[in-house]
Structures are given as structure tokens and as C-alpha cells.
């Protein structure tokens, strides 16, 4: 029937749109591995996609919206891993939760890099519609961490769990620079005799999560 043909055509269009969005996001991620944020432009992205730069504007209005979709995808992957841990961990305590946070986030260094380096600019230059979609994705991760904490420390009430989240999530914005020290930064710190330590992403997260979890107690 005409209705069925129309529905099938709509499904094909949706799949094609999603595939093209993914291709653009993948190209952005590929460029960001070797280029600075300011050098990743829609023109550069267009050079490594199968369609023209002009066509990119059918899917994203600014390069910041592409980055927003990229970090949104990263947050979704993190949430997937957290939900899997929630389903698989029969017994969970605070020490194991710190390990889970460290393991799952150390697999998402791209997300941590964008969070610490460019997030304000990305949000500022994205539409309210795109930003709303991202905040929904971010909220899912927030809820996953809350659910894991509720399972690991059932004695904590919602206010105490929220206090942990409002310490841990801001910390995430600062992880990357402490784990990716450039030669220039290293030389400057050596010049002033600054005794610094370079941590792996996993070690820094596990250590900080353990400290925050140890200090999280039920609200009076």
C-alpha cells in the first residue's frame, strides 16, 4: 500500500541520515586526534567525508555541534558500560565502584579531552535543540553513577549520593591535562624544579574516586 511504501521510504531516509551523521562525527574524531580544536573545521571535515562541505550543513549548523554530537556519543558509550557493570556486579562495594569508574572512564579519553579543553566553546556555539539532546545524554550518565552508588552504598540517601556526583563530575573536567603533559609543559616544570607526577587516567580516577567515596556519608 501507499502507506507502507511511505513508511519504508521514511525508514530508509532515517537510516541514511544517521549514517551520514556518523560519518561526519567519525571524521571529526579522526581529525581531533592530530589537530587542535581550532584547526578542525567543517572544510577539513568535508575533505575526508564522502560528500561535500555544503552537505554537512544539512546535518550540523556549526563544527561545535559536530563536537557536541561526538562527546554525546562518548557519554552514551560510557553509560552503556556503567549499565553493563550495574547488571553484572552481584555484590558491589565502594572500592569496586572506584575500580568501575576508573576502568570505564579510562576507555573514554576522547571524552575527557573534549570536556577539559573545549566544552564551554562547544556548548556556547550549539543550538538549544542540540544542547538539550546532549544534556539528556549527560543526564543518563549521571543517573547510572547514582544507581551504582546506591547499590555499592545502600546506606547513603539521595542527598549524599548527589553530593558525591557533584564532586566527581566536576573532577572529570580536569582529568585530561594531568594525564597528558606536553614536552613544553614538562620543560617548564623542570625549569622551576616543580616535583610533578604524571598519572595514568585510570590511576588518577581510581585514587580520586576512592577518596571521594570514603568521605561520602549519609546526610544528617
Report the location of each language-model feature:
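Helix-turn-helix
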Residues: 23, 31, 35-65, 69
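N-terminal intrinsically disordered/low-complexity leader segments
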Residues: 10-17, 217
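Single conserved hydrophobic/aromatic residue that forms the stacking wall/gate
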Residues: 1-9, 13
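Hydrophobic alpha-helical connector segments
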Residues: 69, 83-111, 164-168
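Alpha-helical structural segments
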Residues: 19, 23-30, 48, 65-85, ...
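All-alpha amphipathic helical-bundle segments outside canonical DNA-binding/catalytic cores
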Residues: 151-169
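C-terminal peripheral helix-coil segments that are non-catalytic and often amphipathic
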Residues: 140-155, 174-220
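Amphipathic alpha-helical segments used for helix-helix packing
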Residues: 107-132, 183-188
Amino acid at each position: 500500500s501507499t502507506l507502507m511504501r511511505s513508511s519504508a521510504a521514511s525508514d530508509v531516509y532515517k537510516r541514511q541520515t544517521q549514517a551520514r551523521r556518523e560519518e561526519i562525527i567519525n571524521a571529526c574524531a579522526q581529525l581531533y586526534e592530530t589537530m587542535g580544536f581550532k584547526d578542525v573545521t567543517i572544510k577539513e571535515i568535508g575533505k575526508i567525508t564522502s560528500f561535500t562541505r555544503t552537505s554537512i550543513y544539512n546535518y550540523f549548523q556549526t563544527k561545535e555541534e559536530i563536537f557536541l554530537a561526538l562527546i554525546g556519543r562518548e557519554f552514551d558509550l560510557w553509560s552503556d558500560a556503567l549499565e553493563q557493570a550495574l547488571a553484572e556486579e552481584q555484590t558491589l562495594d565502594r572500592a569496586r565502584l572506584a575500580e568501575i569508574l576508573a576502568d570505564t572512564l579510562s576507555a573514554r579519553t576522547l571524552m575527557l579531552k573534549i570536556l577539559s579543553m573545549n566544552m564551554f566553546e562547544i556548548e556556547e556555539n550549539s543550538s538549544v535543540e542540540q544542547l538539550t539532546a546532549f544534556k539528556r545524554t549527560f543526564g543518563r550518565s549521571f543517573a547510572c553513577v547514582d544507581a551504582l552508588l546506591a547499590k555499592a552504598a545502600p546506606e547513603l540517601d539521595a542527598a549524599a549520593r548527589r553530593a558525591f556526583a557533584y564532586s566527581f563530575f566536576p573532577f572529570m573536567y580536569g582529568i585530561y591535562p594531568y594525564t597528558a603533559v606536553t614536552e613544553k609543559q614538562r620543560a617548564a616544570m623542570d625549569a622551576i624544579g616543580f616535583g610533578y607526577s604524571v598519572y595514568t587516567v585510570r590511576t588518577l580516577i581510581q585514587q580520586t574516586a576512592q577518596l571521594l567515596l570514603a568521605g561520602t556519608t549519609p546526610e544528617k
